[in-house]
């Protein structure tokens, strides 16, 4: 009996010590986690997100700090809201944060995540990105499409001149979607959407895909509520849009195969690479379709959204508009009415204006999320593998500690003597991201935007259509994968040529 009591006491002591050790370990780990707001059972911090997540996350960061830990349902989310913290994620530990989280939308719409933008990090992704950069996005290749950009921009200018002659307004938001869509369609498919039914259908499908990628399916974060995505039609829309896009691209690829391989557009180039087996790994036909989709997403949304915000800010800030017009119009005279891409190379104020719009209106205010592949310390905090990371570029680029007390103001002059570029070297300015996952299509987007703004501002004076704020365009945002204006930008052009 005495022996049994002794053994029981020893076992009880050992179990107690083990449980105490586990408790202390968990407590120590929790103490070393980033600050977190309180959360609700089941849904975590989802209730604290607004229709504009970049703004609500910024508000939370002002209270809990530039590195905070949220929970969307059962998923831990590390929110980064300062350049200093972003430095550790995107530079110091870039490889550990190089993966992408899996989501229902990406899996259903993006070939199971086998594309470049949303695909998981690994050898296959590195090979695919290399194919894109070396064959599609080199400076030489981007420059070779200047004639296409010029032709499509001239088409838009003709519409504006017609509106000017009749003193009528134009929906600039609509024009800014059409222009990059036509340019991208001609570069990628060899046809423009406004003149071809297949290209028009493809534009529609790309828009639907972007809208679905910008939605927030509850099942990704709270599996117990995944039935809601079925009831509200999200799952059905994913299936319908994905199949519709795949069928369209099958048709496009087949037409290119039947026409012969002349390496005239991106589809031809990719088919040539596939047939020559020259890329060092086996690319599937579906890979081609989704590389083209990546191009449409990157080539249309960034350019159209940026153009919309540039013209919004210029009309709202007539002094900036006048200064930019003076710079551009001094260039027009010796070169005729159309400004070419080589003419904008030395337009410092134009480049400063575009940079400032990227700062205050980044098309992707929340950089596409990353997934931590192994445990790591960030700013002294323990971050566990499997944590998703959201970098709030919108908050970083409005940080008064970096940009000064006028950080909320639109002020292009701050960039005139700046060495900032678009390649993510300075983590306080990351409109295209940084590190391994930086957007590879920077030059493609900038090439169209710069020459478009130069011609719009150089050839026309502008006046916004009267609205609730008089002739001042408002700054109300819509939200999706990219953040454009909620209401169309309607303005009156007045030709000065």
Curated annotation (Swiss-Prot):
UniProt source species: Arabidopsis thaliana
A single GO cellular-component term on record: membrane
Residues reported to bind heme: 439
Family under the similarity heading: Belongs to the cytochrome P450 family.
Main location: membrane
InterPro entries per the UniProt record, alphabetical: Cyt_P450, Cyt_P450_CS, Cyt_P450_E_grp-I, Cyt_P450_sf
PROSITE patterns registered for this protein in UniProt: CYTOCHROME_P450
Claim: Membrane is one of the keywords in the record: yes
Keyword Transmembrane helix: yes
Protein name per UniProt: Cytochrome P450 71A12
């Amino acid at each position: 009996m005495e022996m049994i009591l002794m053994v029981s006491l020893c076992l009880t002591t050992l179990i107690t010590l083990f449980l105490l050790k586990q408790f202390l370990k968990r407590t120590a780990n929790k103490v070393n986690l980033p600050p977190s707001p309180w959360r609700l059972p089941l849904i975590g911090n989802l209730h604290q997100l607004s229709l504009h997540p970049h703004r609500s996350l910024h508000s939370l960061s002002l209270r809990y700090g530039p590195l905070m830990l949220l929970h969307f349902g059962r998923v831990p989310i590390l929110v980064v809201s300062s350049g200093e913290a972003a430095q550790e994620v995107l530079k110091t530990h870039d490889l550990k944060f190089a993966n992408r989280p899996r989501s229902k939308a990406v899996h259903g719409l993006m070939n199971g995540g086998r594309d470049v933008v949303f695909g998981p990090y690994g050898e296959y992704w590195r090979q695919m990105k290399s194919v894109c950069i070396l064959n599609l996005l080199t400076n030489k290749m981007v420059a070779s499409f200047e004639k296409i950009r010029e032709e499509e921009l001239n088409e838009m200018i003709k519409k504006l001149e017609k509106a000017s002659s009749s003193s009528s307004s134009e929906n600039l938001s609509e024009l800014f979607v059409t222009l990059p869509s036509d340019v991208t369609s001609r570069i990628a498919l060899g046809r423009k959407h406004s003149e071809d039914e297949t290209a028009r259908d493809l534009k529609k499908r790309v828009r639907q895909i972007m809208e679905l990628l910008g939605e927030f399916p509850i099942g990704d974060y709270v599996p117990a509520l995944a039935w809601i995505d079925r009831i509200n039609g999200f799952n059905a829309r994913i299936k319908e849009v994905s199949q519709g896009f795949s069928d369209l691209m099958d048709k496009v690829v087949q037409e290119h195969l039947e026409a012969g391989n002349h390496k005239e557009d991106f589809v031809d180039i990719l088919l040539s690479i596939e047939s020559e087996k020259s890329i060092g790994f086996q690319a599937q036909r579906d890979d081609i379709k989704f590389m083209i989709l990546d191009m449409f997403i990157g080539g249309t949304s960034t350019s159209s959204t940026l153009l919309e915000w540039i013209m919004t800010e210029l009309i709202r800030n007539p002094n900036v508009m006048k200064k930019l017009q003076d710079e551009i119009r001094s260039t027009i005279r010796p070169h005729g009415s159309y400004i070419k891409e080589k003419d904008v190379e030395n337009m410092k104020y134009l480049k400063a204006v575009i940079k400032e719009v990227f700062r205050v209106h980044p098309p992707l205010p929340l950089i596409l999320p990353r997934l931590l592949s192994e445990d790591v310390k960030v700013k002294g905090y323990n971050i566990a593998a499997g944590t998703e990371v959201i970098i709030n570029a919108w908050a970083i680029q409005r940080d008064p500690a970096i940009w000064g007390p006028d950080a909320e103001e639109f002020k292009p002059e701050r960039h005139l003597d700046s060495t900032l570029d678009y390649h993510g070297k300075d983590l306080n300015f990351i409109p295209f991201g940084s590190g391994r996952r930086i957007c590879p299509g920077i030059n493609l987007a900038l090439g169209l935007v710069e020459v478009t703004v130069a011609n719009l501002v150089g050839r026309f004076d502008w006046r916004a259509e009267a609205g609730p704020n008089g002739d001042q365009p408002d700054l109300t945002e819509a939200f999706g994968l990219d953040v454009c204006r909620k209401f169309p930008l309607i303005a009156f052009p007045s030709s000065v040529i």
